[in-house]
Amino acid sequence: MIETVSTAAMPSEQETNATNSPFQTVKTIATLILLLLVLPLNLALTAIALLRSIIIKPFQSRTIAESPQTILVGGGKRTKALQLARSFHKAGHRVILVETHKYWLTGHRYSWAVDRFYTVPNPQTEEYPHALLKIVQQEKVDVYVPVSSAGGSYYDAKAKSVLSPHCTVMQLDVETLQRLDDKYEMATAAKALGLRVPKSYRITNPQQVIDFDFSDAQRPYILKSIPYDSIRRLDLTKLPCTTEPETAAFVKSLPISESKPWIMQEYIPGQEYCTHSTIRDGHLQLHCCCKSSAFQINYQNVDRPDIENWIRQFAKSLNLTGQVSFDFMEAADDGQIYAIECNPRTHSAITVFYDHPDVAKAYLEPDPLPQIVQPLASSRPTYWIYHEIWRLVTHLWSPKQVYERLKIIAQGKDAIFEWDDPLPFLMVHHWHIPLLLWADLQKTNEWIRIDFNIGELVEIGGE
């Protein structure tokens, strides 16, 4: 029987004078009603899956690991954390799932892959590494695999020094993480290794852009915040603008400063790719590559040896240990691959390993594997069903879009639902998200969209 342990109390009562706008309230209530309407269908699906498991379980043999380990997986509300928990569990290991106090309600805690569930303080607090250490010591954890947010990866890197004497930590050290998370520093490091990156400049004052000589530029440039910016990261305004005053006005509208530097980077038009790589002592252990875009949350592995070789050389040269995700562009003009940024943390594309038996080896084996673990050729693309339904409903006037969405649903696989582990699917959509929506009715912050992938309501200024 799965045991879940939460060290968090129920969320504190919101201030009574905090109210939403009428539109936000209607939107939230309407969403709650829609989730309630599909509850009977999902209950039936879960019941069928549970009955199926009861019938076939006696005929299944569970994998017994040669050296069973206890794995602590962080970021428990994210689908990628659930996927890793399932992969470790299927390989015969014991999984402890952890999340912050705010998300004590995560539906993933009900997964049969999870032996115990804990909550901890926010990563930004001084208590965070010590709370993790307490769990590591209490549960005799062998390996900690953080599944961090954009802002949380730094704090998991800091926690590594506290945890390392007690367990293996699959995380970059602070110095390396900051270097890779800094778009300009990453580009500089890659260029020094002879690896292809766009032309890049560190910007700490708008005047640098205003004074820049664009006359010899073969491609336009874009500006990106080096510290993570959830809103402006999607702004791909091309520079220079039509006129110099327009360029100056645009640049001055951005919060550029010494403390909040930006990168001015050559804009590479073409096909974007996202990757996930698990690396130990500079050796690439696990790798996937998927076509991508700013709004895409569908993942299907594609074979790109040139991208794999780029990452392999980079990882070996810097002797990395941890999880890193790179974004690449295949330029439409010259056909070359350019690395545009690195996110030193787990990528949601790891969901394409849902049926691979060797994921645990990639994380736990101390020696290089004879072959890199890559998604099976038979693996289906992954998606999140309610994201797809929303896209379908909002494009009903386009037969092409409707066909495309139905094709994705028919040929792919929901990233949360598993026939032999159905409870997370039910609990995320009818417990986790509804409770977040209910709490939102008492808040002043307005949510923009529901991200079922990371298990939260996306708000301006959020993660």
List where the protein language model places each region.
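ATP-binding N-terminal substructure of ATP-dependent carboxylate-amine bond-forming enzymes
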Residues: I2-Q171
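Peripheral (often C-terminal) accessory segments that flank ATP-dependent C-N-forming ligase machineries
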Residues: V5, A9-M10, K361-E463
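Active-site nucleotide/adenylate-binding loops and adjacent lid/helix of ATP-dependent enzymes
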Residues: L177-W262, P269, R280-H283, S293, ...
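A long amphipathic alpha-helix within ATP-dependent nucleotide-binding catalytic cores
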Residues: L254-E258, A294-Q336
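A short beta-strand motif that forms the metal-chelation/ATP-contact edge
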Residues: S277, L286-C288, G335-R345
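Glycine-rich phosphate/pyrophosphate-binding beta-alpha loops
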Residues: S292-N298, N343-H356
